[in-house]
């Protein structure tokens, strides 16, 4: 099974670090003919995945969460990542690629008021969604929880924006303007287009998450020659 909701992470056997039947979908990123595999929770995830998909090669990395909320590959040769990662994390995984580290990923123009309040209130909704009135309105919480009874999102991914959708090497889509990310993209010849998605907290955070099932045309390329 593939899981994508924080409380379900307990399904991982942390005692052995071995892959059983569950793993997080964002633990695998495809870069042409190469799979970047997050093995922080599963020491043998890469082995199992490559057994199933022998047409790919693999490289391991330790992120321990949603990879697309920690790093983004806007175009071949470029990585944009959050401060808990850095060039040393990619020297073997993406050799020779430029690594731009974003130091303040949570300081962006949300336009939705004070997003910091959700950090204090997320225990009310278990982090699945955010609203400034959730803490004081149990009836509203019950209504939304019932409505989202089969949904598995996590609102935390909405407060930073390396979680973007690359359209082509010169164009990328993002939900919000973030100065560091914006400037890094422009410096590398990439035009960011901002697409406001009002209800993104209901559909699992950033634009890359929202479009994870996008199918791209074209063949499998080698970006490491």
Regions found by a protein language model. Give the residues of each.
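The feature marks the mature, well-folded catalytic cores of soluble enzymes
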Residues: 1-225
């Amino acid at each position: 099974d593939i899981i994508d909701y924080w409380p379900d992470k307990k399904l991982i056997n942390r005692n052995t670090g071995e892959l059983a039947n569950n793993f997080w979908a964002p633990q695998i990123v495809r870069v042409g003919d190469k799979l970047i595999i997050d093995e922080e929770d599963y020491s043998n995830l890469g082995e199992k995945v490559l057994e199933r998909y022998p047409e790919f090669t693999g490289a391991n990395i330790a992120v321990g969460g949603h990879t697309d909320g920690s790093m983004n590959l806007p175009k071949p040769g470029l990585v944009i990542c959050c401060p808990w990662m850095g060039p040393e994390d990619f020297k073997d995984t993406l050799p020779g690629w430029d690594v731009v580290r974003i130091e303040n990923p949570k300081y962006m123009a949300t336009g939705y008021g004070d997003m910091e309040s959700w950090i204090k209130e997320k225990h009310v909704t278990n982090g699945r969604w955010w609203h400034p009135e959730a803490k004081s309105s149990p009836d509203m919480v019950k209504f939304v929880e019932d409505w989202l009874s089969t949904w598995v999102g996590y609102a935390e991914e909405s407060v930073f924006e390396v979680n973007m959708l690359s359209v082509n090497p010169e164009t990328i889509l993002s939900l919000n303007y973030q100065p560091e990310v914006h400037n890094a993209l422009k410096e590398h010849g990439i035009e960011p287009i901002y697409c406001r998605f009002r209800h993104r907290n209901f559909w699992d955070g950033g634009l890359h998450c929202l479009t994870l099932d996008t199918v791209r045309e074209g063949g499998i390329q080698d970006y490491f020659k």
